[in-house]
Design a protein with these regions (language model features):
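Pepsin-like aspartyl protease folds
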Residues: 1-13, 42-59, 80-93
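Aspartyl protease active-site motif detector
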Residues: 4-46, 75, 93-95
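Active-site or ligand-binding cleft "flap/edge" segments
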Residues: 1-19, 64-73, 110-111, 116
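Sterically constrained small-residue positions within well-ordered secondary structures
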Residues: 8, 38, 53-55, 64-66, ...
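Glycine-rich flap/beta-hairpin and adjacent strands of clan AA aspartyl proteases
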Residues: 71-125
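Residues in well-ordered beta-strands of folded domains
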Residues: 9, 48, 65, 74-78, ...
């Protein structure tokens, strides 16, 4: 499992982000969701996260910039993700599905992201 902490930009705002291959989905907190397009979910979604169960009725389209590269992905809005190992609040939890979609690979030993597989264009077959 790989985890990297890094700032990404959302609508010009710097957001403390945890890239975590152990999390399937992507989550944002309400202060980030305020600058995103949000919609109500058709039903309440429950997620086991950070030792507890979180519920949401809101989804968002996350448009962000990671190391100068644009990404767009689906995210769930939850009140609080939690704090990192240093006690800093996590604003975005970037999950494995979005990392796979955008060719992002955490390199924990070097505390960086590998974006060599970032797609400049999508080729569908």
């Amino acid at each position: 499992m790989g985890r990297i902490r890094q700032i990404i930009k959302v609508d010009g705002q710097e957001c403390w982000t945890l890239f975590d291959t152990g999390a399937r989905n992507t989550y944002v907190i309400p202060s980030v969701a305020r600058v995103l397009k949000t919609l109500p979910t058709p039903r309440t979604i429950r997620t086991a996260l950070g030792g507890g169960v979180k519920e949401t009725n809101t989804e968002a389209v996350l448009h962000a910039e990671i190391e100068g590269r644009p990404i767009s992905t689906y995210a769930l809005v939850i009140e609080q993700i939690g704090n990192d190992e240093n006690g800093k609040p996590i604003e975005i939890l970037f999950g494995a599905l979005a990392m796979q979609q955008w060719g992002i690979r955490p390199v924990p030993d070097e505390e960086r992201l590998d974006l060599t597989n970032y797609p400049e264009e999508f080729v569908e077959f």
